[in-house]
Structure formats: C-alpha cells, structure tokens
C-alpha cells in the first residue's frame, strides 16, 4: 500500500508538471517551435503555424522589398554576387581594429555596390579595440552613387550574433564631404534577421523573414548547419534541400597570410547558381524572395565577422585556416 501511494503521488505530480509546462510555453509567447523550423513571436498569446515559402517569381511583389526598390535593382536581382572585404593594413601590422569595408561585385567582376561599417566617433574606434568579435555595429550598403540602400545592424553579442536587415526610410550622402548624413526619424523597416545558433564545433545560423511591414512575427525560411572549419555555408529549407549558399573563396596564400581580406560568393538562386556544384536531387525547388535575399546578404557579413575576420586576435599578421576563432 505504501509503494502504491507513492507511485500515485508521483504520477499526479508529473501530470501537474506537464500541464504547467504547456501553460508556460503558450503564455510566454516568445518562441513557438513547429517541426524543424520555428516562428519567433513578437506578440504574447499568439500561436501560429509553420511558415511556408513560395517561389521568388510568384512572391516577388508580396514582401517588404519590391522589384523596383534600389536594393533589388542594384544587388538582389543578381542570381550571384561576390563580396570582397577590403584590406585592413593597420589591423594586419599593428593589430588595430579598423572599421570593415566591402565591395560587392557581379559574376563578371563589375562593382555594383559597397558596404561600410559606420565609423563616426573616437568612442566607437575605442570600443572596437575592446569588443572586437563581440562588438555592436551598423554596416551601410551603398550603391555606386553613394546612396544608402540597406543597413545591417548587430547589437553587442556575448556568444551568439544577432543580425537585423533594415531598409532605411531615407538617406543621402553629401558628395562634398567624407561623411554620411541621415534624415532624422525612425530607423527604417526591418526585413528580417539571422540568429547564430551556438554549437561546440558546427557553424549554425537560423534565417528569418518578417511577416510584412506591420507584422510582428518572424518566419524562419532557412538554416545553415556547416561542419567544423567549413568554408561553405549552404542554406537549406525545411526538407534539408539547398536553396542558397554563402561560400568563402580561398584567395591565395600570400593574401591570406599578409592581408586581412576575404572573398565570399553569395548564391541566391537554387535553379541557376549550382551547376556542377551540388547534385540536382540536393537542390530545393524554392527560390529566395527579395526579402530573403536581403537577409542572406546580411548573413554573409555575419559569417565574415564571426569566423573569418581577425577580430578575436590580439595581434594581426597570422594566417587563419578556417577562421574559427570563437570555437
């Protein structure tokens, strides 16, 4: 009888604990997991189903970014773009952390845009020396005429980086000076975000798109799960099929050893960019929307900061085989 009473009491406690856990999961309203992918909720007490991803041609006008927007006509309409981080000589020879600069090119090597980390004050320059890999930053994407067409934002990250993709409301560059001037007002429209998913040796990210301009949810449309010291970062859908990728190209022993530079190939279109790279059966039939392409472009910057820059080194001038400084 004594053992029976203890067993019944144990079952009752476990049943109450299970009920309490379900109640807390629903009421917290932070993250709802549905199968392999998830949806991040910005409103409480809201339960949603797993997101669906439509083809780019069918969904090009339904997202936040439209086909005629500058970021689309300049970069995102390209099936493949190449990002090259500019050489940072002070970082290489003195270990001084400089603001990152990038050139964006098409597959023919023509420069179509650029990216530059905001560097407006001595305070931020000092912060870069202390925070290095974990530092917060704002990276602006410019067209060839100096207009800001997108902003990549990352707050301070102690472990996992969290990148936001933002379309600015309005901005212009004063061509008569070296500084960029921004109109007062709200920060801009968030298109999506990427969240690094910490793992002891693998390189993982989750990619989200915002559910409309006024939406409060972020739907996961892809994930990256690259192996240890990988140079290739394929983006897979919910079925594990490859829909896009960010790959770091080896640029030669001399440049890798004596400069702080990096070249990345961003492939947006699974139907046009992976000939002789992956077997057809490994490719997804889904094609990234403009919003999703903008998020992937920002994720390429996150990959560069997290794994291939020298930000976690105290001194420059050393070769980074795989760049896994934070592992």
Swiss-Prot record:
Keyword Nucleotide-binding: no
Pfam families: Scramblase
GO cellular component, one term: mitochondrion
Record-linked PANTHER family: PHOSPHOLIPID SCRAMBLASE, PHOSPHOLIPID SCRAMBLASE-RELATED
Protein name in UniProt: Altered inheritance rate of mitochondria protein 25
Cellular localisation: Mitochondrion
Predominant place of localization: mitochondrion
Keywords: Mitochondrion
Protein family: Belongs to the phospholipid scramblase family.
InterPro entries, per the entry: Scramblase
Single GO term (MF): phospholipid scramblase activity
GO biological process assignments: cellular response to heat; cellular response to oxidative stress; negative regulation of autophagy of mitochondrion; plasma membrane phospholipid scrambling
């Amino acid at each position: 009888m004594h053992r029976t009473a203890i067993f019944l009491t144990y079952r009752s406690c476990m049943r109450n604990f299970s009920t309490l856990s379900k109640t807390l999961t629903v009421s917290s309203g932070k993250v709802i997991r549905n199968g392999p992918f998830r949806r991040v909720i910005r409103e409480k007490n809201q339960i949603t189903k797993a997101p669906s991803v439509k083809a780019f041609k069918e969904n090009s006008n339904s997202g936040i970014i439209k086909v005629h927007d500058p970021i689309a006509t300049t970069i995102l309409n390209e099936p493949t773009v190449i990002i090259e981080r500019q050489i940072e000589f002070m970082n290489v020879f003195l270990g001084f952390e400089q603001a990152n600069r990038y050139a964006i090119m098409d597959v023919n090597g023509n420069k179509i845009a650029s990216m530059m980390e905001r560097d407006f004050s001595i305070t931020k320059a000092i912060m870069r020396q202390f925070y290095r890999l974990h530092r917060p930053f704002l990276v602006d994407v410019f067209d060839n005429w100096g207009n800001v067409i997108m902003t990549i934002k990352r707050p301070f990250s102690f472990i996992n980086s969290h990148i936001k993709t933002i379309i600015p409301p309005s901005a212009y560059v004063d061509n008569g000076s070296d500084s960029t001037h921004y109109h007062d007002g709200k920060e801009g429209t968030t298109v999506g975000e990427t969240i690094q998913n910490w793992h002891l040796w693998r390189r993982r990210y989750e990619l989200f798109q915002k559910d409309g301009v006024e939406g409060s949810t972020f739907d996961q449309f892809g994930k990256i799960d690259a192996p240890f010291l990988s140079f290739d970062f394929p983006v897979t859908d919910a079925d594990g099929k490859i829909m896009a990728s960010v790959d770091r190209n080896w640029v030669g022993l001399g440049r890798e050893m004596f400069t702080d530079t990096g070249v990345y190939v961003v492939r947006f279109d699974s139907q046009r960019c992976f000939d002789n790279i992956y077997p057809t059966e490994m490719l997804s039939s889904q094609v990234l929307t403009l919003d999703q392409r903008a998020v992937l472009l920002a994720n390429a910057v996150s990959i560069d900061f997290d794994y291939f820059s020298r930000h976690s080194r105290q001194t420059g001038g050393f070769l980074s085989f795989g760049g896994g400084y934070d592992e």
